[in-house]
Design a protein with these regions (language model features):
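Metallo-beta-lactamase
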Residues: 52, 138-143, 153, 160-241, ...
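Conserved beta-strand hairpin/beta-sheet module of binuclear metal-dependent hydrolase folds
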Residues: 27-69, 175-190, 283-334, 432-451
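Intrinsically disordered, low-complexity Pro/Gly/Ser/Thr-rich segments with frequent PxxP/GP/PP motifs
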Residues: 579-610
Length: 640
């Protein structure tokens, strides 16, 4: 076998793509000595005599057809990223013959993949969006023979392959340059598009992953390649032009992706002119019966309606200390006529809106929220969503909901009619509460929009984050249309954001939603772009399956169809050794534009043989005739 660093004389590169590819069973011959096999990803094969080098083995389907193209041995494999679908068949390689190389910056993801699936996630977990991991590591560790860094040269049969670090589609992604050709993994899809969105979403709407991708695209464009070979989709024949166009697309998209208000000023603003101070510490008055935090507590969650008889309703309560809550309750009783807080309404599923639930429940306060939010509060670790209550610290486990609301409910409370409506946006799991209060129509909207309606440059949208289960058409666009129809006088956002005279602001919010939908459609390759946006179109409930105290658990697998026609699926659960899935394979159909849930029973065979800690269970997904591979997963624990 050729060593990794053995120097050989350079040979002329013969990698100009043929006008017509030549078929060799599972392979297409793109150029003399260069072949492509399409499986869960594009697998590229360089041939020299009867030896070959592979870039991304995918599901390794092509291995069965090597002899038909004259290959007897795979000497080397190069990985572009840690994503399962580009390497899930790697165990089929003969590791006595084949050496594997991968990006050094992805070493931990490949060697210790379960480290990046947390049984008890925290907002600060590395490589996560507020506790929801954006990595998609293999179910089992991968043995790698050489770790590659930016600028390394791989010598193989006279070819010099240069390693170029290109994060963005993956935190440590690597491209491989051979003359004027680039194997760029998932950095770009043909058509100057993203391979998907969810692999580039690295933070809570601040653009870290997007900025890394833009920088990598710029880096590759500077190399002026003629042809690029992507991990998915067609060969990119006009690579330099497409990279330039892609950079422009991403740069144009970025301003609409980043929040529609100056988020860094959220906790630095001064008093709102529509409020006036009160004798209660930190509390300002919006109207005779409506109060909120003033600028000293900007960014915290607290608003309260105090009725004439002293009974009160809280609208979210979190992100500040217990002692502060106890002090302001005393102050409100002394100065604002507060006698009793009856209930606290929760606007959406994120835990920072009810971190003080335990304190309030000790005082008899009841908690209300919409039916679709309840289980996220009561069983937060059953979900792989960001910012669940447990991610805010070890003292937070769950919050019991006392009153389950339904969209359309009207609650009579102290002479007011409280209207409850489903209001998605930042997350699918949100609701709005509105009422006529002190001569104004006031709506409480949670985290769906923020900003200053008087500033024509602001459109108010909060972060775009697919991991919030937040497809734009099913979220922000619905929120905008809802507000346009409601025509409120006052919008009470969470985190102490008061928005008055919001009509034009709402219209800008609506226009932004339409605009960013169009941008995602232009950036993502699938006709139904949601397959490249949503990381939950196959998902498990519970996401964390506890087999540590019982041998059997039922898991509900939900399959989503975004298409306007029936969709066939085949989903294989890649359970670890000693765990049986019944059934092991889910095969069926899902009606157009719908979702369906299928029960699966997991059984533990011999507990003593199970490893301690988290184990990953990938879904190997086929929709209709396309094998997507091991895109998504859930986790289990058989032994603590």
């Amino acid at each position: 076998m050729d060593g990794w660093l053995r120097l050989r004389p350079m040979r002329p590169l013969l990698l100009i793509p043929l006008l017509l590819t030549t078929a060799h069973a599972a392979f297409e011959e793109l150029a003399p000595g260069l072949f492509l096999s399409r499986g869960t990803c594009n697998t590229y094969l360089l041939r020299e005599g009867d030896a070959a080098l592979l870039i991304d083995p995918g599901d390794a389907t092509a291995l069965a057809d090597l002899e038909q193209i004259g290959v007897k041995k795979i000497e080397q494999v190069l990985l572009t990223a840690h994503h399962r679908e580009v390497l899930q068949g790697i165990e089929k390689l003969d590791r006595r013959v084949t050496q594997v190389a991968a990006p050094k910056d992805e070493q931990a993801f490949l060697e210790t993949p379960s480290d990046f699936r947390k049984w008890r996630p925290k907002n600060g977990d590395k490589f996560s969006v507020n506790g929801s991991s954006y990595l998609r590591p293999p179910g089992q560790p991968v043995k790698v023979d050489r770790w590659l860094a930016d600028g390394d040269i791989i010598e193989w049969h006279g070819r010099q392959i240069r390693c170029v670090s290109t994060p963005g589609h993956s935190p440590g992604g690597m491209s491989y340059v051979l003359g004027d050709q680039i194997f760029l993994g998932g950095v770009m899809h043909d058509g100057a598009k993203m391979t998907n969105w969810f692999d580039t979403e690295w933070d809570y709407g601040f653009g870290k992953g997007l900025d890394a991708l833009i920088a990598s695209v710029d880096k590759l464009a500077a190399l002026a390649p003629k042809t690029a070979f992507s991990s998915h989709g067609p060969v990119i024949a006009d690579a330099s032009a497409q990279l330039a166009a892609f950079k422009t697309k991403l740069a144009d998209f970025r301003p609409d992706y980043i929040r529609g208000y100056p988020v860094n000023n959220l906790s630095k603003r001064g008093p709102h002119p529509a409020t006036r101070p009160t004798a209660a510490q930190y509390i300002v008055q919006v109207s005779p019966h409506l109060y909120m935090f003033g600028p000293e507590m900007a960014g915290k969650n607290f608003a309260i309606i105090i009725a004439d008889n002293g009974h009160a309703l809280l609208l979210d309560c979190g992100l500040f200390p217990r002692l502060v809550l106890e002090q302001i309750i005393r102050d409100m009783k002394k100065h604002l006529g507060l006698k009793q807080i009856d209930a606290c309404w929760i606007s959406h599923s994120h835990g920072d809106h009810f971190t003080l639930a335990d304190v309030l429940q000790e005082q008899g306060v009841k908690f209300w929220t919409l039916d679709s939010i309840v289980d996220k509060c009561e069983n937060p670790r059953a979900y792989d969503y960001p910012a669940m209550i447990t991610s805010y610290g070890v003292n937070f486990e769950r919050t019991k909901i006392d009153r389950v609301l339904k969209a359309g409910d009207v609650i009579e409370w102290e002479g007011y009619k409280l209207h409850i409506d489903w209001m998605p946006g930042q997350t699918e799991f949100g609701n709005a509460l509105w009422l006529e209060l002190d001569g104004k129509k006031v709506v409480f909207t949670g985290d769906n929009l923020f900003g200053d309606p008087a500033d024509p440059e602001q459109n108010g949208h909060e972060c775009v984050n697919a991991r919030n289960s937040a497809i734009i058409e099913e979220g922000y666009l619905i929120a905008a249309k809802y507000l346009q129809k409601l025509q409120p006088d006052i919008i009470m956002g969470a985190h102490g954001v008061l928005m008055t005279e919001p009509k034009a602001f709402i219209d800008r919010y609506h226009d932004w939603a339409l605009r960013i939908i169009a941008q995602y459609k232009a950036l993502l390759p699938d006709e139904d772009y949601e397959y490249g946006y949503d990381p939950y179109w196959v998902s498990a409930y519970p996401y964390r399956v506890d087999l540590s105290t019982q041998d059997t658990q039922t898991v509900q697998i939900t399959v989503r169809n975004f298409r306007s026609r029936e969709q066939k699926h085949r989903i294989v659960l890649q359970t670890p050794p000693g765990i049986i899935s019944e059934p092991e394979v889910l095969e069926g159909t899902v009606a157009a534009e719908s979702r369906q849930t299928f029960p699966v029973t997991l059984k533990l065979e011999i507990r003593e043989k199970q490893p301690a800690g988290v184990q990953i269970v990938p879904f190997d997904i086929t929709l209709d005739s396309r094998h997507y591979g091991q895109l998504f997963d859930f986790i289990l624990m058989a032994k603590e």
